[in-house]
Amino acid sequence: MSTSNSSIPASMPRWRQYWVLTKPRVTQLAVFCAVIGMFLATPGMVPYPVLFGGIAGIWLLAGAAFAVNCLIEQAVDAKMKRTSWRPSATGEVTPFHIIIFSIILGSLGMIILWNFCNPLTMWLTLATFVGYAVIYTWLLKPATPQNIVIGGLSGAMPPALGWAAVTNGLSAEAWLLVLIIFVWTPPHFWALALYRRDDYVQSGLPMLPVTHGERFTLLNILLYTLILIAATLLPYIYGMSGIIYLISAIVLGLMFLAYVIALFVSYSDALAKKTFRFSITYLSLLFAALLIDHYFL
C-alpha cells in the first residue's frame, strides 16, 4: 500500500517528525482494511477489547515497519522530490533514534496484540513487518522491477490480520480479501510510479516505468486491473457476500477500468495521478460495500 505525500516544511515539531516516519496515511488505510477483516469474520459485533487492541497493535507495528522503511531508504529518499522532506532523509531524526523508535512501537504493538487479541495475530503481524521492512524494502525493491508484485503479500495482509484477531485462525474468506489487495497493489503503485518516474530515475530504484518504459507499464496496469475485477467477484461466487457487494464491485471495477483505459489510450501525468488517487477510493469503497453487505443482507 502506498499514498502520495505532498511537500511538508522541513522545520517540524519533534513529535511530528516521528509521526511522519510512520507514514500515517498509509497506516490508516492498512488499519481500515484490518478492521474490515475483523467485522467480516463475525456475524455480530467484534468484542471491544479485540477491536481496539487490534487497531492499536496493528497500527503500532505498521508504524514501526514504515519507520524502518524510512531508515533503510534514507539515502534514496534524499534523492527524490516526493520524499526528500522526510526527517530521515534530512537527517533531523538520526538512524539510532529511528531504530529505538521502531523497537518501542513494535514491542508495544506485539504486547497489545498478544494480550488483547491472540498470539497468532501477533506473529502474523510481526511476519508482515518483516515482509515489508526487510524482504520488500531491503531485498526486493532495489533488485527487481517486479518488487511490488513479489513483495506485495506483506501489504495485502491487513484483512487477514483483522480476521485472525477475531477468530484466532485464517479461513478461505480471509485469503480472498488478501488476494484482492494483492492484485490491486500493482496498478495502484505503478500509476504513482508513472507520474513520479523522474524521481525514481534519480533514486536509481528499478521501478517498472524506469526499466521497461511507459507503454509496457500501462499494459501491465491494464492487465492487472482486469485480473482485479475478476478477483473482486470471488467473494460473491464463494458465497461470502450478496448482491450489494456484487453490484458495487462491478460498478467500481468499471470505473477503475475507465480510468486505466483512458490512461492507456492517452497518457498524461495528471491522469496517472487521478488514477492513483481513485485506486485508493476504489479499495475503500469496495471494502465498505463488503461490510454493508455483511451486516444488512
Swiss-Prot record:
The chain crosses the membrane at residues 26-46, 48-68, 96-116, 120-140, 147-167, 174-194, 218-238, 243-263, 276-296. CDD domains: PT_UbiA_Cox10. Gene3D superfamilies: UbiA prenyltransferase. It is a multi-pass membrane protein. It comes from the Bacteria. One of its GO terms (cellular component) is plasma membrane. Keywords: Cell membrane, Heme biosynthesis, Membrane, Transferase, Transmembrane, Transmembrane helix. One of its GO terms (biological process) is heme O biosynthetic process. Pfam families: UbiA. It catalyses: heme b + (2E,6E)-farnesyl diphosphate + H2O = Fe(II)-heme o + diphosphate. It is an enzyme of class 2 (transferase). Its EC number is 2.5.1.141. It is found in: Cell membrane. Pathway: Porphyrin-containing compound metabolism; heme O biosynthesis; heme O from protoheme: step 1/1. The keyword Flavoprotein does not apply. Converts heme B (protoheme IX) to heme O by substitution of the vinyl group on carbon 2 of heme B porphyrin ring with a hydroxyethyl farnesyl side group. Belongs to the UbiA prenyltransferase family. Protoheme IX farnesyltransferase subfamily. Carbon 2 of the heme B porphyrin ring is defined according to the Fischer nomenclature. This is Protoheme IX farnesyltransferase. It comes from Polynucleobacter asymbioticus (strain DSM 18221 / CIP 109841 / QLW-P1DMWA-1). The lineage of its organism: Bacteria, Pseudomonadati, Pseudomonadota, Betaproteobacteria, Burkholderiales. The gene is ctaB.
